[in-house]
Amino acid sequence: MPADVRPARPQPLAPRVRFWLAPYRLALHRLARYRWARRPAAGRLAASGLAGPVLVGTVLAAGLSGCGTQSSAAGNVITVSPGACGAGWHSVRAGMQTFQVRNSGTAGAEAYLINPASGAVFAEVSGLGPGTTRPIRLDLGSGSYAFQCFIQDTDTLTGPTVRVGGHHPGARGILPMTTNDLLGPARVYHAYVSAGLGTLARQVGVLTRLIHAGRLNGARAAWLSAHLTYERLGAAYGTFGNYDTQIDGRPDGLPRGLSDPAFTGFYRIEYGLWHGQRARQLAGPAATLDRDVLALRRFWPSMEVDLLDLGLRTHEILENALEFQLTGHDDYGSGTTLATTAANITGTRELLTILHPLLVARYPGLPAVYAGLDKLHSLLVTEERPGGRWTPVRALGTDRREQIDAAAGQLLQELAPIAAITEPRR
């Protein structure tokens, strides 16, 4: 197994209920606060607003609870245990159905509602502790179904097949992604980042030399080129760990804020270059950035790409851009957060290109994703000015800012299902 990919799927510890259908769209203000978290994570729900085989968080309130046994008075009680996977179906009909999935065993479990012939998944309950019950409510279409159970220290079990009559289309499932499906894309992505880090190291070297020479006008242009290169790497920041904090960290939460010695990297240099600091004040931060980038490049070949991150970051990159760049939060003087967002779009596109062969047959909303990327990018680049300058967010007119925010919010809705669709499953 190459050192650059990590196939192991972490065992979920917290409850999660997912549904492979899409009855409504989430509002922009919810998406702006939405945060995917690395598994395991309490109550993480996939969300989408597109029709077709995608994930949404239409969950009964009890399904969000992280502890206790939930009421099973309503709906079919589906048993999950080593001796009875998926037992308990009765009075099954097409249309909206509620299943109470109960773990009657002594070990943690998860259960999928699947098409037993194709393996397509319609719903999932994860982190199901012993003695607990979680509800699933979904639009059950006509066809054949079975529950598939994954219990700790037990082989995969598939329950009895149940036929639902009639001609109701219901929710459509999607084929689950496997670890093997994602190993190739992870290698391609690893190579993409390697090339990007080589470019970044050269650009940061130029920036450092310009600062040491006192050529601060040239350093400002070099800073922007290098920073955008880093932002185009997109998904990697989750893998970079502490290096990302050193290279692209904010002063938020530091005791001395902007003057704190722990405030390093691109934003520290940006602040100095655009707030009248002299070359001698910036020489130290520039040397530190150069050292950190070279260290990251040196260690990257041995770093792992978490397979879960490949799809996760397609949404999270631009979610972070909406929160920090399009609000102007991360403008430390250069006024280039719109350029940063455009670079984030490039990083998102790269991930989508790598994942495209896997997504095209699983996600019918993919054309809307590409259209959304094009729309947002076109709005951003109209704010580029001669000489490498950009309109700061604070200087945008109300109409243009609303257009950009709306385009970003819509795009996030289109991107939201991809993380769950590409999550490697057993």
State where each predicted segment sits.
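Secretory targeting and sorting signals
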Residues: D4, R38-S71
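Short coil/turn motif common to extracellular beta-sandwich-like domains
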Residues: V92-F99
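Mature extracytoplasmic or organellar-lumen-exposed domains after removal of signal/transit peptides
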Residues: G170-R426
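A short tyrosine-centered beta-strand micro-motif
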Residues: Q97, T133, G143-C149
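Short beta-strand/loop motifs in extracellular/secreted proteins, especially
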Residues: Q97, A107-A111
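Extracytoplasmic/periplasmic copper-protein system
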Residues: G68-P82, A87, T154-R187, P424
